[in-house]
Amino acid sequence: MKSWATVAIPPLDKRFVLPELSLWDTARAGNFPLPNKNLYRIYVCGITPYDATHLGHAATYLTFDLAHRYLRARGAQVRFVQNITDIDDPLLERATRDGVDWKELAQSQIELFRGDMVNLHVLPPDHYIGVVEAMDLVTSAISTLSERGSTYSVDNDLYFSVHADKKFGSRSHLAHEE
């Protein structure tokens, strides 16, 4: 899937020294400086395109855009991936409610989102992946999890069983019950 038009980044004056960037590390429960690396990988969850984007979306993408720009300004390579959930219950429900084809609704909202990102001058991801185009990978992963006994069913929907993952909660510090 195509993302949006790239944004020109003017060169940073070589005399400018960037301060160290610290980020919250949920696993260690504190702010820690980013390690110095040549390559950083960023993944950001994208929208479910059933309605117009809003300030909450903008806040997320602007936050990651700042981190992306900071890393590039430090001379690092950044591999930035973002998904888009272009098939999901809220999208299907909105399409049914409005009497429109869900694919057309998704496409129209994706175009609006792209326009918003261009207007906000957000750097586009290197890879912009829709769920529809990744469906074979998704169904294969679900099949593997089901074969391992790592899923359970409620009303014909499959859910991941957090009890199947001994490390569940190790980064978030959440108990299985939470």
For each of these PLM feature ranges, what is it?
Residues 1-178:
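NTP-dependent nucleotidyl-transfer catalytic core
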